[in-house]
Amino acid sequence: MSKAASQYATLEDLPSKPKRPQTGFFIYKSEVFAKRRTECPTLKVPEIVSKISEEYKALPEKEKQKYEEAYRKEKATYDKQNDQWKEKYGDIEKSLKDQAKKALKEKTKKSKAAEKELEKSKKKAPAAAPAKKDDKKAPAKKK
């Protein structure tokens, strides 16, 4: 493992990957959601989102294009950042995933071996004989 890789012991230690950009619909939704919520305070969130979805579908193509263009710009930035992340940390991530997979296999193997051993010991140990009741009756009392 390289010197850079040695500072990352687990996948959680790696810097987080860039987040994917929001689609045109989600950009639109984030712009109008608060307004729709105040217009219809009795509606539940899924109902509001459903209405926003219908609105977005009904938007003229020219207006939709504005949101799609914003998405494409964010996507280009994301792709660039993601490529840089993969170039810098991709091999380290793969190595750490492989290590985690091997560790899990080993743990599973040990667990199964312990399970088999337990089954063997149960079969070898004789079952405890049930306690016998004393058939003798209590002696009769003398008068």
Swiss-Prot record:
GO terms for molecular function: DNA binding. It is found in: Nucleus; Chromosome. Signal peptide: none annotated. Residues 100-120, 131-143 have a biased composition (Basic and acidic residues). InterPro entries: HMG_box_dom, HMG_box_dom_sf, HMGB. Disulfide bonds: none annotated. Its main location: nucleus. Keywords: Chromosome, DNA-binding, Nucleus. SMART domains: HMG. Pfam families: HMG_box. The modification Blocked amino end (Ala) is found at A70. Residues 18-86 bind DNA. Residues 1-22, 100-143 are annotated as: Disordered. One of its GO terms (cellular component) is nucleus. This is High mobility group protein B.
